[in-house]
Amino acid sequence: MDKVNSCCCGVNAKPCCTDPNSGCCCVSKTDNCCKSDTKECCTGTGEGCKCVNCKCCKPQANCCCGVNAKPCCFDPNSGCCCVSKTNNCCKSDTKECCTGTGEGCKCTSCQCCKPVQQGCCCGDKAKACCTDPNSGCCCSNKANKCCDATSKQECQTCQCCK
């Protein structure tokens, strides 16, 4: 089934939320999604249209945070993307940050939605840098220490070094 690109999940959703199992997409977090037998998308409330196994209708607040956090991971259900190891999120349209996961989230400072800083390397044999969007630091490899892109100072909190 061709993927549908005209419906979205959640109030803050921008990119469409497609169910990878069926090719259907949800119109919202609460509305019905697709028939369990034929996998056809439905907009009514008929039999088999309960959205029970449609993954895109389930909240996904912890999209890209934690130890292996890289550049932001967008959550189509909440309209947020992770910014740090503490699950801070930012809205995809305004780039405002929120400490919650969706509607009514409180805005704080957002790092991962800002352009990543490039151009610094540390160590004797520094090659291409590993940029950490959470701290703004980058390092030459996972063994060397990190440096700030502007001051070239060591950055002990650069997660990409760990």
UniProtKB/Swiss-Prot annotation:
Which GO MF terms does the UniProt record name? cadmium ion binding
The residues of the propeptide are: 1-2
What upregulates or represses it?
By cadmium, and to a lesser extent by mercury, copper, heat, hydrogen peroxide and IL-6.
| Keyword annotations from UniProtKB, A to Z | Cadmium, Metal-binding, Metal-thiolate cluster
Superkingdom per UniProt: Eukaryota
One matching Pfam family is Metallothio_Cad
Q: Which InterPro entries match?
A: Metalthion_7
Protein function: The metallothioneins are involved in the cellular sequestration of toxic metal ions.
**Family classification:** Belongs to the metallothionein superfamily. Type 7 family.
Name listed for the protein in its UniProt record: Cadmium metallothionein
Q: Recite the lineage of the species.
A: Eukaryota, Sar, Alveolata, Ciliophora, Intramacronucleata
Q: Which gene carries the instructions for this protein? A: MTT1
